[in-house]
């Protein structure tokens, strides 16, 4: 009787040690996530659950991105998203700034080191701005009461305020560091994803309790939530596995006096969704940015400034038709844009030319690159529309069932994509580790 491949995972000392280290780091991260920012006002945090303001809606959106740490005003309230946002910004700047593109193309190894270094540098000011913006949002929950005691940027309040902001920045840096430890010594290249994953999954029990406490109709909402949850997982997995295979021909090679080695054929896989959940994260970051800026001017003494800031915060904080339509458009647009950027960076035409592989009927180099880009654009369209629909699904269901947008979802749409994508990547990693040890069966048939 053939043993299960899962048994070999635990039998292999190398894989077992990496899994145990990863689990240990995640436990440490979740313990730190329960440490609140010093001097926070519990009254404001308690009022958040019953808040129906635009600031409260925006905090709930940002809370999903932080993995639930923002609602408790933890020192990890910003999670690792300043780092991810910095990484996305630098990747998007690559095609615009030739020097960055040349650095990544000429020496990929050194280019990656340069990218990691500057991503860390850029994440610090982004974390600073995010911390100030989040504090400003919490200060709007209860008028006249701040989320941090002795909050202010002048006089005797300056030093405590600065210390709290630096504490939040340090929390983000700790989260990034723990993620990098996992990527290097645990499950490789999955550190930051697992940090986010652990935060999202940790919200499941609280979400179930929230649904169960929703009056006499809890069973109805729970049943709908479970059905939506399972159908969404199936749809996401189906899309993530969608691939278009482009045929490649490998010409024969001359082997001196031994004659000519016959060529062969292979395929180049192009995924329907090659960028995962990044468009959702970037679209949500962009659409919430105006509301974060507006939070500084809501209480302005100039009427038109205060009215404009209030309008922006009301329309960019989630729930309304304006927000839902704009969110859908941004997700679709960023899916196309980010796919184009990553496809350009891969430079399939030049790489295939160096390997001697050709697409039948196409000239090597630029012609091949343009042909593959057209195919990628065509198959990206259904993937982009699907991501857009997944993004606005909670709001559509909330409107149909006349409930809060989040009450019908055990996990948010972006959270589902992250969880499913992370699980898939972990399985791929474990299968590759088993293959290196001579075991070629799939973990999931």
Model-based region annotation:
Residues 1-445:
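N-terminal cationic and glycine-rich segments that engage phosphates or anionic surfaces
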